[in-house]
Amino acid sequence: MHDIKAIRDNPQAFDAAFTRRGLAPIAGSLMKLDEVRRAAVQAAEQAQARRNAASKEIGDAKKAKDNARAEALMAEVTELKTTMPALDAAVKEADEALKKALSEIPNLPLPEVPEGADEHGNVEHHRFGEKPSYSFTPKPHYDLGEALGMMDFEAAAKLSGARFTVLKKGLARLERAIGQFFLDVHTGDHGYTEVNPPLLVKDDAMFGTAQLPKFREDQFAAGAIGSGGEGYWLIPTAEVSLTNLVRESILDEKELPMRLTALTPCFRAEAGAAGRDTRGMIRQHQFTKVELVSITTPEQSKDEHERMLSCAEEVLRRLGLHYRVMTLCTGDMGFASQKTYDIEVWMPGQGEGGAYREISSCSVCGDFQARRMDARSRGSDGKPRFVHTLNGSGTAVGRALIAVIENYQQEDGSIAVPDVLQPYMGGLKVIAKA
């Protein structure tokens, strides 16, 4: 969420950055809402101040035995008591209107983010490795998985409907191995602290990381739980749980950056555009992901963003997968992001002749989420300030499974197990039909 004071101080600069997202200028309408709020606050404060002063004057009038003045002042206080609830209600209404407006507009892109309307405006940053070559035509993961008897979409549809998958035997074990491998690298080599967070969160948590209110329809609501009747949400990403661990807190800057990671199921009601990726595991309502979250000072966040990207890349490098890194343009960035790198892994079984598919997004959010969460830090000067937050996939386990299946497929339909995963598979080198 944005700082209305900063918008008031320089509305032209705010609109210049905001319109780079392809959106209309908005600073003027926000300042009008703020003017209404400030006027309401001023009226309420003046009424309270007059009530306090009049109450004191009543005592003075009584001491002076000025009964007429005392009675007039008491009548004034009574009238103020009657009008003040309406003034307080006006303040609350104006506050909520401004907060709602601020909560529904996206973060501002950093100056170096390329301009563009959609994914076609994204810019390649760099790439790793080469596309593998085959003496046969590579198959998509769903054909390979079904032929192995280890990927069952029909059974999943009976249980849950479209966009779910049942994994069995070797592929179920392979997905588990990938997730464990990712966690071991990030905790053992990259210094992240492993967390096992709740999968159900409250409204405040979803608001804090900016899934609510704008993306309410994209989420799975778990309904009312318990006698309190409070609703819960299934997390769309562990970013929600991990980032909100610092909500409503003041951290010691000596402890920053704080780096957290979690391997969790994720749940998303929006599984992509209608008719797109309807087969296979690319777009699922439920999927597994290793999330990376960093909490930093403003001075640390830029370097931390580059570091997070390299951590996400490293697990793919160790798997021997070819990928490219894209800098997302202003029109393709996420709502809370200031700048985002997407890692797109090569999948030879996708489309005609293979395709790059997103497997990780690494974003720096500045203080956008911190303001929503009231997450601050205190440095040597003793003054609290908002932290910066970053999040990234380290990486999506289901898509990494697809990438391994398609890149390591063999002509007979079996799947070679990458060397780094074999210890997690009990030494198994090939997944084949029994």
UniProtKB/Swiss-Prot annotation:
Pathway: Aminoacyl-tRNA biosynthesis; selenocysteinyl-tRNA(Sec) biosynthesis; L-seryl-tRNA(Sec) from L-serine and tRNA(Sec): step 1/1. One of its GO terms (biological process) is seryl-tRNA aminoacylation. It is found in: Cytoplasm. One of its GO terms (cellular component) is cytoplasm. ATP binds at residues 268-270, 358-361. Homodimer. The tRNA molecule binds across the dimer. HAMAP family: Ser_tRNA_synth_type1. Consists of two distinct domains, a catalytic core and a N-terminal extension that is involved in tRNA binding. Belongs to the class-II aminoacyl-tRNA synthetase family. Type-1 seryl-tRNA synthetase subfamily. This is Serine--tRNA ligase. The gene is serS.
